Amino acid sequence: MSFSITLPDGSKKDFEESLTIADLAQNIATSLGKAAVAGKVNGELKPLDYKLDSDSEVAIITNKDEEGLDVLRATAAFVFEAVAKCEYPELRLGEHVADEGGFYVDTDKDDQIKVGELPKLEKAMQKVIKNGEKIEHVQIAKSELEELYKNDKFKSELLAKVEGDTVDAYKLGDFVDFGFDALLPNTGKIKQFKLLSVAGAYWLGKSSNPMLQRIFGTAFFKEADLKADLKRRQEIKERDHRTIGRDLDLFFVDPKVGAGLPYWMPKGATIRRAVERYIIDREVADGYQHVYTPVLMNLDAYKTSGHWAHYRDDMFPPMDMGDGEMLELRPMNCPSHIQIFKHHIRSYRDLPLRVAELGMMHRYEKSGALSGLQRVREMTLNDGHTFVALDQVQTEFAKILKLIMEVYKDFDITDYYFRLSYRDPKNTDKYFANDEMWEKSQKMLKGAMDDLGLDYVEAEGEAAFYGPKLDIQTKTALGNDETMSTIQLDFMLPDRFGLTYVGKDGEEHRPVMIHRGIVGTMERFIAYLTEIYKGAFPTWLAPVQAEIIPVNNEAHGEYAEKVRAELAKRGFRVEVDDRNEKMGYKIRESQTQKVPYTLVLGDEEMKSGKVNLRRYGTDEEISKSLDDFINEIDADVKSYSREN
C-alpha cells in the first residue's frame, strides 16, 4: 500500500503504511507533534487518532489555531457532560456546541441545575482534568446507544438523525456521548476553563419544544487568555443595556404581560423623548414634513406592496373585522407614507417631497429571539421616505447621508463603515425584475458615495427586493456588527401603487422613492447608546441632569428648592434628594445613578448663593456661584446638541 499526504504548503509525503494524524504531526516535526490537537483531512475536522491510509490533503491543527480552541472547548463540554451525569444520574443531555464564544451544553432534569451549583461541578471537572484521564474515540453500534439512551428523549432524538449502523463516539470512563468532530485524547490537555452561567433554551431552538437549562462555559490553552476573556465578559456584562436598564430603572419587560413589549419607566422615557425631539427637530430643519399615520392598515395594502408575500412570517395575523375588511398591524411604514403622497395631486414643484414619522410598528418575533430593547415585538422606527424625480436621486441621497453623518457626530458615533448592497446577479429571480433599473440605481448609489469621497465595501445579494441600498454598519459596545442606518432606492413601490407627479412637460411621471432610517428604531438605538455610554449618558440625554442634596433638610431645604426651581425654569432636568438618609449615602447614590452633576448645599452655599459641585466620575469638589453653574451646564448641554 502506497499513498501520499499533501500538506497545506503543497508539499507531499509518501507512506507505505497507514498512520494516525498524531503520527503524521510527529513525522513532520517533534514540536508539531507536541502542539497538535487535531487534523483536517480533505477539509473535515478529525481527531488525532484518525487513521490515514489513502491519498489525502491534511492540515495539522495546533493549540495556536482557532479550530484548536474549538477542539479544546468541545473536550471541556464533553468532560462537563461526564461530570454532570455522574453528579446527577437522572440528568438528560441535549445539544452541545463549541465555537469562538466558548461552549454550552443543554441539560434537563426535574430540578434544573442552578448557577450556584457551577462551582461544585467545576471542582469535579478539575479533579478529572488533574488525573489526566483517557478519552477514547470509539465506534459503537447504534443499537447499543439506543438502549443506553432509551430513557433520554433528547439524546434519542439526536441519535435517530445519525445515519448508519455504527456511531462515532467518545468515552470517558463509563460515560459515552456522540456528535463531536474531534476531542483531545485525554483530559489533562484541558489547561484553563471556566463554567460561566446558566440560561433557559428551547430544545432545538423551537418555542413549541420544552425549555431546557443551557450551561455556558469557555476554555483556553493559556491562563492569560482565560483571564483576558473573563475580563472582557465582565465588561460586556457591565455594559449590557438590560442590566443597566434595570439598575437605572429605565425600562422593563414582563413576559406575563407580554414578551418583547417593553415598558418605559420615567427615566427611560425621558432619554427616549430627548432623542425623539432631537431627531424630529433635525429632520424638520432638513425639510421633512412630520406626520402621524395609523398602526393598522387594510391587508390589501401589504398585498399590493409585496410585504404580505415577502414578510408574512414576520407579521402578526390579520384581524377579520367581520364585514370583509381585514386589518393588519403594520410591520413597516412605507405603505402609510405612500398614502400621504397619493392624497394630493403632485407636481414636479413638490419634489423632493420628504415625509418622516416616528412610526410604531409590530413584528412577529419568536420568543427565543427577543432580547431587552434590541429585539422586540413593538417598536418605533425613525422612518422617512423621500419622493424624487429620477434626476434628483443622487443629490437627495447625498443630502440624506450628510444628515446621518451630522447626527452621528452629535451622538459621538465613530466606529462604523459603509456597505453598498446590490442584488445577486446570479440569482435575480428574488428581485424586482428590471435589469435597466438595477444597473441605473446601483450606479447612482455608487456615484453618490464616490462624489462624497467615502470608502465603502460592496456586497452582492444584500439588496432589498425592490432596490439597492446603503447600509451603515456600526460596532456596538459589546462588539457586535449592527446596521444603524439605511438608505434604499425603490422603483418598485411607486409602480405598484401607481404614484405619479405632473412634470414640467405637463405629463405624468413616476417618482422614485427613497427609504431611509437615520438611527433605526428607538428601542434598538437607546439600547446601543446605553451600552456605548455604559449608562453614563451625556448631560443633554441624561434623565436627571443635576441632583441637589441639602446637607440638612430643615436648614437647607428651602435653598435647595430655590436652586431647583431656577434650574428647572431654564429647562434643565433636576431633582432634590430630601430623603432622611446620610449625606454620604446620597452622594454615592447620585454617582451610582450616573447623574452628571451633584450639587451639595449647606450653610456656606446658602449664605453665599453658591453651589458645591461634583461631576460624575470625579471626587473633586468645586464651589461656584449659581449663575456660573447655570452657564456651565448650559454649555455642557449645548456641546452635545445639533448646533455643534
From Swiss-Prot:
<dbReference type="GO" id="GO:0046872">
    <property type="term" value="F:metal ion binding"/>
</dbReference>
<dbReference type="InterPro" id="IPR047246">
    <property type="entry name" value="ThrRS_anticodon"/>
</dbReference>
<dbReference type="Pfam" id="PF02824">
    <property type="entry name" value="TGS"/>
</dbReference>
<keyword id="KW-0820">tRNA-binding</keyword>
<feature type="binding site">
    <location>
        <position position="334"/>
    </location>
    <ligand>
        <name>Zn(2+)</name>
    </ligand>
</feature>
<comment type="function">
    <text>Catalyzes the attachment of threonine to tRNA(Thr) in a two-step reaction: L-threonine is first activated by ATP to form Thr-AMP and then transferred to the acceptor end of tRNA(Thr). Also edits incorrectly charged L-seryl-tRNA(Thr).</text>
</comment>
<dbReference type="InterPro" id="IPR002314">
    <property type="entry name" value="aa-tRNA-synt_IIb"/>
</dbReference>
<keyword id="KW-0479">Metal-binding</keyword>
<dbReference type="InterPro" id="IPR036621">
    <property type="entry name" value="Anticodon-bd_dom_sf"/>
</dbReference>
<dbReference type="Pfam" id="PF00587">
    <property type="entry name" value="tRNA-synt_2b"/>
</dbReference>
<keyword id="KW-0963">Cytoplasm</keyword>
<keyword id="KW-0436">Ligase</keyword>
<keyword id="KW-0694">RNA-binding</keyword>
<feature type="region of interest" description="Catalytic">
    <location>
        <begin position="240"/>
        <end position="538"/>
    </location>
</feature>
<dbReference type="GO" id="GO:0140096">
    <property type="term" value="F:catalytic activity, acting on a protein"/>
</dbReference>
<dbReference type="InterPro" id="IPR002320">
    <property type="entry name" value="Thr-tRNA-ligase_IIa"/>
</dbReference>
<keyword id="KW-0547">Nucleotide-binding</keyword>
<dbReference type="InterPro" id="IPR004095">
    <property type="entry name" value="TGS"/>
</dbReference>
<feature type="binding site">
    <location>
        <position position="385"/>
    </location>
    <ligand>
        <name>Zn(2+)</name>
    </ligand>
</feature>
<dbReference type="InterPro" id="IPR004154">
    <property type="entry name" value="Anticodon-bd"/>
</dbReference>
<feature type="domain" description="TGS">
    <location>
        <begin position="1"/>
        <end position="62"/>
    </location>
</feature>
<dbReference type="InterPro" id="IPR033728">
    <property type="entry name" value="ThrRS_core"/>
</dbReference>
<dbReference type="GO" id="GO:0005737">
    <property type="term" value="C:cytoplasm"/>
</dbReference>
<dbReference type="InterPro" id="IPR045864">
    <property type="entry name" value="aa-tRNA-synth_II/BPL/LPL"/>
</dbReference>
<dbReference type="GO" id="GO:0006435">
    <property type="term" value="P:threonyl-tRNA aminoacylation"/>
</dbReference>
<keyword id="KW-0030">Aminoacyl-tRNA synthetase</keyword>
<dbReference type="InterPro" id="IPR006195">
    <property type="entry name" value="aa-tRNA-synth_II"/>
</dbReference>
<keyword id="KW-0862">Zinc</keyword>
<dbReference type="GO" id="GO:0016740">
    <property type="term" value="F:transferase activity"/>
</dbReference>
<dbReference type="Pfam" id="PF03129">
    <property type="entry name" value="HGTP_anticodon"/>
</dbReference>
<keyword id="KW-0067">ATP-binding</keyword>
<dbReference type="GO" id="GO:0005524">
    <property type="term" value="F:ATP binding"/>
</dbReference>
<keyword id="KW-0648">Protein biosynthesis</keyword>
<dbReference type="InterPro" id="IPR012676">
    <property type="entry name" value="TGS-like"/>
</dbReference>
<dbReference type="InterPro" id="IPR012947">
    <property type="entry name" value="tRNA_SAD"/>
</dbReference>
<dbReference type="InterPro" id="IPR018163">
    <property type="entry name" value="Thr/Ala-tRNA-synth_IIc_edit"/>
</dbReference>
<dbReference type="GO" id="GO:0004829">
    <property type="term" value="F:threonine-tRNA ligase activity"/>
</dbReference>
<feature type="binding site">
    <location>
        <position position="515"/>
    </location>
    <ligand>
        <name>Zn(2+)</name>
    </ligand>
</feature>
<dbReference type="InterPro" id="IPR012675">
    <property type="entry name" value="Beta-grasp_dom_sf"/>
</dbReference>
<dbReference type="GO" id="GO:0000049">
    <property type="term" value="F:tRNA binding"/>
</dbReference>
<comment type="subunit">
    <text>Homodimer.</text>
</comment>
<protein>
    <recommendedName>
        <fullName>Threonine--tRNA ligase</fullName>
        <ecNumber>6.1.1.3</ecNumber>
    </recommendedName>
</protein>
